[in-house]
């Protein structure tokens, strides 16, 4: 009896500690944003010059060096490019937002081509799951800022390219300062709020925006705010519902697909800078990696009543894009919170109280993910089968036992809550719980040898 009381108190304390840590993290993030806001608000334009938030400047180059001629000779002999094109590139500055699967190849080709100045924006750090597609990062730079890691690789590729690192997130209060002095901006991000932020800022500052995306085996590419072409809001005046948005962390992506789109973003940026070719404005390039087919379709022209780029815009300053879109401006794990911690199970509780007893453990990840790794007693029932009730054919008899605990898990503890919500509606008298933090928490707190992805 005493042991049971101690276990109960221990569990309660752990929950309180977890809740306090979450609250502390949230407050610290709010504090950082407030400090950034105050810092930027109190600086004048002149004070910003020279620090990491200022875009590059410097003398205008009027001739090529012997090293330039040797290094760029194969593109110098292109009739539409030539010496003048190389000089334009050498005097240009490009801001790449997101040093991931798109940003890495884009930066690599821009640096190799002789772009004079590159700005690299990324708040994140290098981790092993990046390596298959984020080709500028390496094993020995795990934990390093992605912007700094990319700078090291790009300097080795072309020491004549000046690199400015912005190892921070873009917010409405700092975006204009960072973007202002660059000639072209590349959107290599993986989230909707940042796409709106970049588009709005580029319209206000009259900067072309080369926008790419890649997911699974597909990719898309277009150029916004160029010539008479539309902005992002012209095409998407209303953001999609959060549940309709999938990033590569959840949906997966093949590295060669991000490489294809990222390289083409570099190509479009070069065309914009040099003034050559037919820039992909007012058109959308769609790449189907499964069949290796490229399609080029026309998209709508400027929207006369666009809230941002019309003659009489309704939006005249950057807004709260997370609130506007109803989702976080990051592709990091943003936990779903459908239930309080009292209505869920920690992995420690499950391991200590339930795992050794009769129960039904349902893993709701897609089959492809279940095959990567699984707990020995888990039954794979993908979330889609939970939601359409097709799981009843497989598990109906087991679920007739109201005394049998039902535990659901997924990779991070998000989809499992959706499954719990559905099962509780159908089986209101059953004990149905999900594991907080999913398999990632299992690795962190129970079995460090269990693989994570």
Swiss-Prot record:
Domain Rhodanese: 355-451
Keywords: ATP-binding, Cytoplasm, Metal-binding, Molybdenum cofactor biosynthesis, Multifunctional enzyme, Nucleotide-binding, Nucleotidyltransferase, Phosphoprotein, Transferase, tRNA processing, Zinc
Main location: cytoplasm
Active site: 248 (glycyl thioester intermediate), 410 (cysteine persulfide intermediate)
Essential cofactor(s): Zn(2+)
UniProt entry tagged with the keyword Flavoprotein: no
Catalysis: reaction(s): [molybdopterin-synthase sulfur-carrier protein]-C-terminal Gly-Gly + ATP + H(+) = [molybdopterin-synthase sulfur-carrier protein]-C-terminal Gly-Gly-AMP + diphosphate; [molybdopterin-synthase sulfur-carrier protein]-C-terminal Gly-Gly-AMP + S-sulfanyl-L-cysteinyl-[cysteine desulfurase] + AH2 = [molybdopterin-synthase sulfur-carrier protein]-C-terminal-Gly-aminoethanethioate + L-cysteinyl-[cysteine desulfurase] + A + AMP + 2 H(+)
PANTHER family: ADENYLYLTRANSFERASE AND SULFURTRANSFERASE MOCS3 (PTHR10953:SF102), UBIQUITIN-ACTIVATING ENZYME E1 (PTHR10953)
Protein's UniProt name: Adenylyltransferase and sulfurtransferase MOCS3
Organism annotation: Drosophila sechellia
Gene name of this polypeptide: Uba4
């Amino acid at each position: 009896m005493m042991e049971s009381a101690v276990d109960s108190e221990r569990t309660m304390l752990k929950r309180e500690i977890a809740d306090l840590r979450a609250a502390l993290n949230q407050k610290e993030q709010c504090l950082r944003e407030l400090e950034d806001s105050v810092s930027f608000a109190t600086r004048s334009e002149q004070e910003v010059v020279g620090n990491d938030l200022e875009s590059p400047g410097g003398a205008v180059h009027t001739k090529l060096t012997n090293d330039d001629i040797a290094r760029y000779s194969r593109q110098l002999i292109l009739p539409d490019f030539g010496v003048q094109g190389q000089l334009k590139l050498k005097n240009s500055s490009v801001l790449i937002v997101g040093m991931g699967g798109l940003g890495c190849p884009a930066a690599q080709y821009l640096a190799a081509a002789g772009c004079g100045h590159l700005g690299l924006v990324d708040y994140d750090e290098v981790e092993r799951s990046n390596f298959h597609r984020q080709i500028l990062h390496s094993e020995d730079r795990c934990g390093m800022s992605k912007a700094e890691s990319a700078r090291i690789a790009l300097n080795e590729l072309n020491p004549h390219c000046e690199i400015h690192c912005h190892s921070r997130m873009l917010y409405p209060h700092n975006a204009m300062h960072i973007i202002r002095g660059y000639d072209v901006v590349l959107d290599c991000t993986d989230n909707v709020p940042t796409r709106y932020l970049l588009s709005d800022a580029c319209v206000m500052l009259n900067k072309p925006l080369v926008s790419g995306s890649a997911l699974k085996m597909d990719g898309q590419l277009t150029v916004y705010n160029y010539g008479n072409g539309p902005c992002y809001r012209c095409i998407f005046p209303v953001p999609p519902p959060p549940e309709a948005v999938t990033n590569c962390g959840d949906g997966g992506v093949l590295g060669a697909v991000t490489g294809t789109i990222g390289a083409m973003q570099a190509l479009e940026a070069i065309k914009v800078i040099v003034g050559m070719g037919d820039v992909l404005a007012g058109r959308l390039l769609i790449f189907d990696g499964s069949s290796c087919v490229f399609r080029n379709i026309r998209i709508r022209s400027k929207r006369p009543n666009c809230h941002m780029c019309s003659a009489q815009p309704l939006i005249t300053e950057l807004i709260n894009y997370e609130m506007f879109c109803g989702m976080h401006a990051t592709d990091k794990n943003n936990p779903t919170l459908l239930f309080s911690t009292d209505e869920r199970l920690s992995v420690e509780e499950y391991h200590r109280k339930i795992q050794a007893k009769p129960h039904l453990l349902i893993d709701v990840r897609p089959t492809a993910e279940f095959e990567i790794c699984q707990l020995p007693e888990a039954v794979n029932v993908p979330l889609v089968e939970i939601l359409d009730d097709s799981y009843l054919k497989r598990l109906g008899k087991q679920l007739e036992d109201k005394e049998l605990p039902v535990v659901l898990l997924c990779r991070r503890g998000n989809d499992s809550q959706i499954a719990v919500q559905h099962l509780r509606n159908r089986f209101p008298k059953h004990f149905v719980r999900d594991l907080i933090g999913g398999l990632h928490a299992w690795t962190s707190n129970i079995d460090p040898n269990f693989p994570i992805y």
